[in-house]
Amino acid sequence: MAADPKAEEYLIASIRAAMENVRRRTNAPFGAVIARHGTVIATAVNEVDDLCDPTAHAEMQAVRAAARALNSVDLSGCTVYASGYPCPMCLTAMYLSGVEKVYYAYSNEDGAPYGLSAERGYIEIARPLDQREMTLQGLHVRDDGEDLYQAWQGITPASS
């Protein structure tokens, strides 16, 4: 894989955004930059504590901002530059939105001494369902009338 000539520059930008956030607030030290074809589309920081939102990780906030900037949930061709190793939630959001590449500056090992490793989430997801800490159980419940998914399929373009 060819090296991204902007990777170091954008990773430094993500680290600087995270550092500014740390100095201003009490949020975790994470920043993210999203670019498409060499142009920055979004820059975001962790806002979990400020927003009382456990999903407001820097990468999630950047994905949201990029989608709004592009007026599309399709982030194909985009690259994420994250100050830290993405957690499973953020990585999944990037997969679902079509992000092409992800670069990170600080590894899980770098973050572990500070309680900032995402490793626990990856370990938990890799476990069989019956061995996970949190119960995840499907119950085959349906409402009377039209099926939910069939109704959605009937109003959604085939490409969705």
Stretches found by the model and what they are:
Residues 14, 18-21, 32, 58, ...:
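Small-residue (primarily alanine) positions within well-ordered alpha-helices
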Residues 48, 82, 106:
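Residues that line or immediately flank small-molecule/substrate-binding pockets and catalytic motifs
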Residues 55-56, 60-97:
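Helix-adjacent hinge/juxtasegments
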Residues 5, 28, 49-57, 85:
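Residues at secondary-structure transition points
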Residues 1-23, 86, 93-160:
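Zinc-dependent deaminase
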